Amino acid sequence: MPLFQNATFHISAHNLSDLPAPAGIEVVFAGRSNAGKSSALNTLANHNRLAFVSKQPGRTQLINFFSLGNDRFLVDLPGYGYAKVPEAVRKHWQLTLASYLSQRPCIGGLVLVMDCRHPLTPLDRQMLNWYSPSGKPIHALLTKADKLSRQAANQTLQQVRKELEASWGNCSVQLFSSLKKQGVEEAETVIGRWLFAPEDDVPDAVA
C-alpha cells in the first residue's frame, strides 16, 4: 500500500498569513506549470484527485496542504512559469514562495518536479537558489520519463545529478513517470525518510 495512501486535504493558503502555525514536518512539492507535479502527488498518494490536475497550466494559485496525520504534511506549491499569469500575480508568488521556502522552520525537504525533457530551467534554478541556503535536502523528480528512450532518460539523469551536486549540494535525483508508475517506491523511500525519524515506525500507509 502506498505510504501516502491516506493523505487528505488540510488547508489552502494564498498569503503567508494564511499558513497554519508551524508544526511537525512539511515536505514541499515545487515545479513549473505542466511539469507533472500534481500528477506526481496523485500517483504517490494513489488518489486521482488529491492534487487538482488542471488542463490549464498555472491555474492553481494556492499553497495546498495535505495531512498525513501526526503533524506530517505534503505541501503543493503553485506551479511557476506560466506565461499568461498577470505580472502582479507572478510577483506576489515570487515573494511568497521565496519567503516560505527560506523562513518556514518545519520544512523537512523539497521535492523539485521537472519535466525530464526540459530540466533545470532558469526558474527551477531560482527555486533551488531560494531553498538551498536552508541546508535542508532536495530531491528532484524527473517526470514524464516515459516520453524518452531509456538511454536518453538515463543520460538526462546523470547530467542533472552532476549539475545538482556541483551547484547546490545535498541533492538527490531520480526518473519518474506517473503514467507508468515508474520510480514510485524510490520517491516514497526518500520522502518517508524526511517525514519520519529513524526511530519512528513508518506504517504501510500513514493514518
Curated annotation (Swiss-Prot):
Cofactor: Mg(2+)
Organism for this UniProt entry: Methylobacillus flagellatus (strain ATCC 51484 / DSM 6875 / VKM B-1610 / KT)
Alphabetized GO MF terms: GTP binding; metal ion binding
InterPro entries, sorted: G_ENGB_dom, GTP-bd, GTP-bd_ribosome_bio_YsxC, P-loop_NTPase
UniProt similarity note: Belongs to the TRAFAC class TrmE-Era-EngA-EngB-Septin-like GTPase superfamily. EngB GTPase family.
Any Pfam family matching the protein: MMR_HSR1
Positions annotated to bind GTP: 31-38, 58-62, 76-79, 143-146, 176-178
Keyword Repeat carried by entry: no
Entry keywords, A to Z: Cell cycle, Cell division, GTP-binding, Magnesium, Metal-binding, Nucleotide-binding, Septation
PROSITE patterns: G_ENGB
Organism classification: Bacteria, Pseudomonadati, Pseudomonadota, Betaproteobacteria, Nitrosomonadales
Name listed for the protein in its UniProt record: Probable GTP-binding protein EngB
